[in-house]
Amino acid sequence: MQRVGSSFSTGQREPGENRVASRCPSVALAERNQVATLPVRLLRDEVQGNGCEQPSFQIKVDAQGFAPEDLVVRIDGQNLTVTGQRQHESNDPSRGRYRMEQSVHRQMQLPPTLDPAAMTCSLTPSGHLWLRGQNKCLPPPEAQTGQSQKPRRGGPKSSLQNESVKNP
């Protein structure tokens, strides 16, 4: 596993977003076999359509009770892993002593057409962790075949025009 030092963040903030540092820095995927940790952004409002292009991939994970720093989202090739742990202890003389532990673990395989470097991760106030991504851009058809898609000259349309000129 290799870590790369550039960030997934586009530098643009979404409406209602508070940036909270994740406990692991974000890293970009330069090659398929590298591992990346996505930053978890905390949103002030629930996720809604904002008129932007819809993501080609999205998943919602129940992470109620977790803070962004409690969650780790990793991409390893085409595998996505979401893990989180949280502990809380109290020793209140009037209420007694208690210890609470909570964990979440989700793992799935990403579609091969997905661009892992374009993935975003947001945590809503209601505790939903949204992971969104776009498909990789495909090269134009010319680059795929190596041939130009120029229209042919002298096709059926031009021969019809010539016939109409010959027959007045």
From Swiss-Prot:
Feature: compositional bias, Basic and acidic residues: 86-104
Residues of the sHSP domain: 38-151
Q: From the Swiss-Prot or TrEMBL record, state where the protein is found.
A: Cytoplasm; Nucleus
Claim: Signal is one of the keywords in the record: no
- What domain of life? Eukaryota
Main location per the UniProt record: cytoplasm
Record keyword Cytoplasm present: yes
Q: In this entry, which stretches build a coiled coil? A: none
Stretches with biased composition (Polar residues)? 1-12, 158-168
Q: What tissues express this gene product?
A: Testis specific.
Task: State the InterPro entries in the record.
Answer: A-crystallin/Hsp20_dom, HSP20-like_chaperone, HSPB9
Region annotation (Disordered) maps to 1-25, 83-104, 129-168
Q: Which GO terms describe its cellular component?
A: cytoplasm; nucleus
Indicate the family of this protein.
Belongs to the small heat shock protein (HSP20) family.
- What is the protein name stated in its UniProt record? Heat shock protein beta-9
Q: What is the lineage of its organism?
A: Eukaryota, Metazoa, Chordata, Craniata, Vertebrata
